[in-house]
Amino acid sequence: MALLMSAYPDLSVRDLRDLLARNATRIDAGQQPVQVSYTAANGQPRQVTGLEGWERNAAGLWYSPTYGFGLIDVNKTLTAAANHTPLPPLVQLPAQKVTVPRSEGSIADVGSSATRSSTQVAQALTVEAVQVTVSLDHQRLPDLLIELVSPSGTRSVLLNPNNSLVGQSLDRQQLGYVRTKGLRDMRMLSHKFYGEAAQGEWRLEVTDVSNSSRQLTLVDLNTNRRSTLTERNNSQPGQLLNWSLRVIGHDAARS
């Protein structure tokens, strides 16, 4: 970054990021997605992607949640910078909030399909990043897979299942009650849609992928003391309450 800035001091941070992303080299190209298999409540086996490997978005850019856009190629980026056209001014759309009707927001335990909610973006923008906030009720957050699907069909995992959001189970074990019902305006950001068209339908999907109890070992870093935490399955379905979408990008007509 410093080398690029010294060679081309007039380029903005957004332009530098654009150059780095478009000229990066894919490493560990054989990286495979992490698949999560479970038996749905209807008895049918189901498999979902809990963490993506390398995937190419609709703008033709490769992206991995592990490696981002890839390894920086300094020489290639410097060469491209010589003929780079600066990006149009940044546009940050207001957050579009979607309140989900109760009849549509139930998150089934080990569901045979995802709970879905959609919103439309009318503006013709080229995406640089997408910000999502989510509010939902659920008694065991590590069961949840949260994904965002773009108008072009690109799918980005925003929250991985088997995550470390174990505070509810810890409260239940240590306090006898739970202080939180789930997520409230949890903010998540995705760069996977970089370069895609923002206009069209964006869809949020939430899936509960587990109904089995789990045991975790917790380590106190101060005392090195170990304790066991039992995560019991949620006793009732979750509920998607609301979510919002905010697109950050630039005028597609000026790209």
Question: What are these regions, as identified by a protein language model?
Answer:
Residues 1-62:
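Hydrolase catalytic cores
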Residues 15, 19, 78-86:
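Extended recognition patches within non-cytosolic domains
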Residues 62, 81-255:
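Loop and turn regions of beta-sandwich accessory domains that flank beta-strands and are enriched
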Residues 26, 77-78:
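Active-site/binding-pocket entry motifs
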